[in-house]
Amino acid sequence: MSAKIIDGKRLSQEVRAECRARAARLAEKGTQPGLAVVIVGDNPASRVYVRNKAKACGETGIYSEVHEFPENANQDEVIGRIQELNGNPGIHGILVQLPLPRHFDSSRVTESVAVEKDVDGFHLYNVGALVTGSSIFPPCTPNGVMKMLEKYDIPIEGQHAVIVGRSNIVGKPMALMLLQKGATVTICTSRTRNLAEHTSRADILIVAAGKPRLITAMMVKPGATVIDVGINRLSDGKLAGDVDFESVKEKAGYITPVPGGVGPMTIAMLLCNTVVAAEQAHARLQGN
């Protein structure tokens, strides 16, 4: 048996087409969605992500601008810029590119983004809304995973979902979103004892541990859906996920590749959140 490949690249194009149509309708009414990205330092991966986001915005009809700061930037200076963007009516979404330099308090910086412009979903208000099932801006990567499961008609209710990784960006919000859809959820880490005992019981296995090829075929239930959120650069320069794709694809029912799986969906959901923020801003202007 060979798993069906969940094509994140193709699916992201469908999602982006929907966003493009909504952005065009807004533009006809006089509001072009706008996204500002704040980046601090010279992290090569972060710069690639920012370029990809800017390119995707241009292709979707979203205005974008990048605010760059050096590695030794003052935190208050960065927060001051974010506060300026909070008051800019032409900017509807603000994204702080993580990670920030070590001398920054990441929570304080992300908390400085206005709630209504928090398209990454990292503000405490939006985190709380996610807990209660009323989030307007769900975090982009978990939301992209949920969209994948939906589009491929993969059942969630009543299924056992195992998440490897407990980050605030992926693991924890992913668990909440699956719980809201009726899954039984187990959260593990790369240090969980007898990890394979947990992963091998999963109907849906989502891996976001940052450990290349952590999950092997022997750790996967036959026919399971395997979502690989990890992306790691190996010593030979090649990219690898947290799942040993070649072996696991022979055992899983569905699997995402790396690259071309979750990554494109993350950007697509960021675009959607930005359009939603612009739609809400336009409605406020109209007094609705």
From Swiss-Prot:
Swiss-Prot/TrEMBL keywords: Amino-acid biosynthesis, Histidine biosynthesis, Hydrolase, Methionine biosynthesis, Multifunctional enzyme, NADP, One-carbon metabolism, Oxidoreductase, Purine biosynthesis
Amino acids binding NADP(+): 165-167, 190, 231
GO cellular component, one term: cytosol
Catalytic reaction annotation: (6R)-5,10-methylene-5,6,7,8-tetrahydrofolate + NADP(+) = (6R)-5,10-methenyltetrahydrofolate + NADPH; (6R)-5,10-methenyltetrahydrofolate + H2O = (6R)-10-formyltetrahydrofolate + H(+)
Pfam families assigned to the protein according to its UniProt record, in alphabetical order: THF_DHG_CYH, THF_DHG_CYH_C
GO biological process per UniProt: L-histidine biosynthetic process; methionine biosynthetic process; purine nucleotide biosynthetic process; tetrahydrofolate interconversion
InterPro entries with a match to the protein in the record: Aminoacid_DH-like_N_sf, NAD(P)-bd_dom_sf, THF_DH/CycHdrlase, THF_DH/CycHdrlase_cat_dom, THF_DH/CycHdrlase_CS, THF_DH/CycHdrlase_NAD-bd_dom
Signal peptide: none
Taxonomic superkingdom: Bacteria
PROSITE patterns, alphabetized: THF_DHG_CYH_1, THF_DHG_CYH_2
A GO MF label: methylenetetrahydrofolate dehydrogenase (NADP+) activity
Entry EC no(s): 1.5.1.5, 3.5.4.9
Pathway(s) it belongs to: One-carbon metabolism; tetrahydrofolate interconversion
Function: Catalyzes the oxidation of 5,10-methylenetetrahydrofolate to 5,10-methenyltetrahydrofolate and then the hydrolysis of 5,10-methenyltetrahydrofolate to 10-formyltetrahydrofolate.
Family: Belongs to the tetrahydrofolate dehydrogenase/cyclohydrolase family.
PANTHER family: C-1-TETRAHYDROFOLATE SYNTHASE, CYTOPLASMIC, C-1-TETRAHYDROFOLATE SYNTHASE, CYTOPLASMIC-RELATED
Quaternary structure, from the entry: Homodimer.
Record-given protein name: Bifunctional protein FolD
